[in-house]
C-alpha cells in the first residue's frame, strides 16, 4: 500500500469515513446502514442487493440494542482487542462458537439432529452473513463487517491490486470450509492492518471506500457489451417479479449462474410461476465468478432484459429439436448455468418468433468451428483433430508451421511452444509470426489468464 496515496485519501475526506467506522465501534450506530449504503453504491451495481445489506445491518443493530449484554460487550472490547495478538486460535474459536449456536438453533426448530447438517448450517450463515458480521464487529473491532455479498470478485480485485493473499477457494460442497473461509479472511485482513499500522476503522475505510474506488468502482460492469459467445439458462429467484419491475438498461442483477459466463453472453430466464416458461432474455454484464460466501457459489451479473411472450415447458418438450435437450428431458431441474448450443438457442428464437415475438433485434449465436468427428481424449487430439485443420482452413500449409519448435533460453535450457507459424531457425535468434498453445481444457477464467500468460511468455523469448 502506497502510504502517500493513503495520506492524500485521508486529507481528501477519507478521515470522515474512518471516523464513521470509529463511531460504530464505540457504540454510535445511528444511520450506519445508510452510511454503508452510500459506500456500496460506488462498487455494487445491484440496487436490490444494497437494499438487502441495509436491512440486515438494521436488523443486527436492533438485536444489539435489545441485548442486555451490549454495554458489557463494549467494555470488554478493548481487552479482547489487546488479547487477540496473543491468541492465534481466536478466529477459530469465534467460528466454532457461531457454528455451534447455529446448530443448536436449527435443532430447536426441527427437533431432529439428523436434519441439522453442515449444509443446512452453512445455508443459514450465507443468508445472514452481513447480519452476523455486524454483530461480530460490534463485539470486537478485529472482526471486520462483511459488505461484499455476491461481490467476491470485487474483493478479489482489491486483494490482487494490494497484494493481499486471500484464502484458497474451497470446493462447492465443502460447507464447513467455506464457513471457515470468512474467519480466515478476517485473520488475513487483521495481519494486513497491522502491517500497515492501521486501526480497525481505517481498515474498514480502506476496504469499503478507498480500495473499491481505486480498482474502478463499478467499472467491472461492462457498459458496452460485445457480441455473445454463449447462451445460458438460469431459473428465476423467488423475487423475480421485483427483478422484472426494476429491470432496465442501467441495472445489473446478481444471481447464480455459470462462472464461465462472459460479458454479452445470452441469459435465458426461466420462471416457474405463474407458468413454467422462458419469459425474458437478458445479457451478462460482467464475467462470471466463484463466490465461496454466496450460497449458490457460482455468481453472474446480468441485465438489459427483453420480455417475450412465454415459451412454455410444454412447448419446449413438444418441439422436435428442443425436446431432445438433456435439460428439457430433466424437466428443467438443475438449470442454473446450463449452456445451450448455438443451434439450440437459435431454435428458441425461432419458436419465439413463431409466437409473434419480434426477435430481429435479439442477440444471435453462430456455431463455433469443431471437427464433426473429433474424439478428444488427450491434448494431442486437440492439436491433430482441431488445431491443425483450423490452421489449414485459415490458409496455412503444413510447410508454414512447425510443432514443438525448440527455443533456447540460455545454457542447457530450452522451451517448446506447441506451434510456431512461419518459423525462422537462426540459432539463438529464432523467430516466428505467431505461436499457438493448445489446451485440452481450461477450467475457468483464472486458468485462461494463466495459460494466456504462458503463451505471452513464450512469445517474448525470441518470437
Locate each region found by the language model:
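Compositionally biased, charged N-terminal/linker segments
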Residues: 10-16, 212-263, 272-275, 340-341, ...
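Aromatic- and Lys/Arg-enriched surface recognition patch
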Residues: 279, 283-342
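Charged, often low-complexity linker/regulatory segments
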Residues: 1-45, 342-403
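Active-site-adjacent loop/helix micro-motif of nuclease/hydrolase catalytic cores
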Residues: 243-246, 292-293, 309-315, 430, ...
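An N-terminal alpha-helical hairpin/helix-loop-helix interaction module that forms a charged
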Residues: 1-125, 140-226
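A short, conserved, highly charged catalytic patch centered on acidic carboxylates
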Residues: 263, 272, 361-461
Amino acid at each position: 500500500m502506497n502510504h502517500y496515496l493513503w495520506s492524500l485519501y485521508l486529507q481528501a475526506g477519507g478521515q470522515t469515513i474512518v471516523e464513521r467506522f470509529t463511531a460504530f465501534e464505540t457504540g454510535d450506530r445511528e444511520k450506519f446502514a445508510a452510511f454503508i449504503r452510500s459506500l456500496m453504491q460506488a462498487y455494487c451495481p445491484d440496487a436490490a442487493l444494497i437494499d438487502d445489506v441495509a436491512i440486515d445491518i438494521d436488523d443486527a443493530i436492533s438485536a444489539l440494542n435489545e441485548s442486555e449484554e451490549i454495554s458489557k460487550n463494549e467494555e470488554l472490547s478493548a481487552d479482547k482487542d489487546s488479547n487477540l495478538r496473543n491468541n492465534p486460535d481466536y478466529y477459530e474459536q469465534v467460528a466454532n462458537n457461531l457454528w455451534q449456536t447455529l446448530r443448536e438453533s436449527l435443532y430447536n426448530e426441527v427437533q431432529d439432529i439428523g436434519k441439522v447438517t453442515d449444509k443446512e448450517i452453512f445455508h443459514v450463515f450465507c443468508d445472514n452473513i452481513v447480519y452476523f458480521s455486524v454483530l461480530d464487529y460490534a463485539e470486537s473491532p478485529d472482526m471486520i463487517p462483511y459488505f461484499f455479498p455476491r461481490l467476491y470478485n470485487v474483493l478479489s480485485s482489491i486483494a490482487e491490486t494490494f497484494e493481499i493473499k486471500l484464502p484458497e477457494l474451497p470446493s462447492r460442497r465443502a460447507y464447513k470450509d467455506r464457513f471457515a473461509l470468512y474467519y480466515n479472511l478476517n485473520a488475513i485482513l487483521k495481519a494486513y492492518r497491522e502491517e500497515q499500522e492501521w486501526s480497525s476503522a481505517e481498515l474498514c475505510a480502506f476496504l469499503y471506500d478507498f480500495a473499491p474506488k481505486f480498482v474502478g468502482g463499478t467499472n467491472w460492469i461492462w457498459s458496452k457489451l460485445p457480441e455473445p459467445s454463449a447462451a445460458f439458462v438460469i431459473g428465476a429467484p423467488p423475487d423475480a417479479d421485483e427483478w422484472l419491475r426494476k429491470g432496465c438498461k442501467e441495472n445489473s442483477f446478481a444471481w447464480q449462474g455459470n462462472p464461465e459466463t462472459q460479458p454479452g453472453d445470452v441469459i435465458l430466464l426461466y420462471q416457474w410461476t405463474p407458468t413454467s416458461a422462458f419469459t425474458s432474455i437478458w445479457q451478462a454484464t460482467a464475467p462470471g465468478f466463484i463466490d465461496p460466501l454466496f450460497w449458490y457459489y457460482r455468481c453472474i451479473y446480468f441485465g438489459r432484459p427483453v420480455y417475450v411472450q412465454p415459451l412454455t415447458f410444454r412447448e419446449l418438450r413438444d418441439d422436435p429439436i428442443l425436446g431432445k435437450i438433456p435439460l428439457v428431458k430433466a424437466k428443467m431441474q438443475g438449470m442454473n448455468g446450463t449452456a445451450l448450443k448455438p443451434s439450440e438457442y437459435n431454435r428458441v428464437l425461432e419458436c419465439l418468433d413463431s409466437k409473434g415475438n419480434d426477435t430481429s433485434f435479439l442477440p444471435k449465436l453462430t456455431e463455433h468451428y469443431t471437427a464433426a468427428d473429433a474424439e478428444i481424449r488427450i491434448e494431442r487430439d486437440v492439436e491433430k483433430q482441431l488445431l491443425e485443420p483450423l490452421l489449414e482452413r485459415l490458409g496455412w500449409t503444413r510447410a508454414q508451421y512447425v510443432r514443438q519448435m525448440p527455443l533456447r533460453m540460455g545454457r542447457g535450457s530450452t522451451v517448446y511452444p506447441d506451434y510456431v507459424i512461419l518459423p525462422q531457425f537462426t540459432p539463438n535468434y529464432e523467430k516466428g509470426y505467431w505461436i499457438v498453445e493448445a489446451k485440452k481444457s481450461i477450467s475457468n477464467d483464472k486458468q485462461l489468464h494463466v495459460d494466456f500468460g504462458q503463451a505471452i511468455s513464450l512469445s517474448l523469448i525470441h518470437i
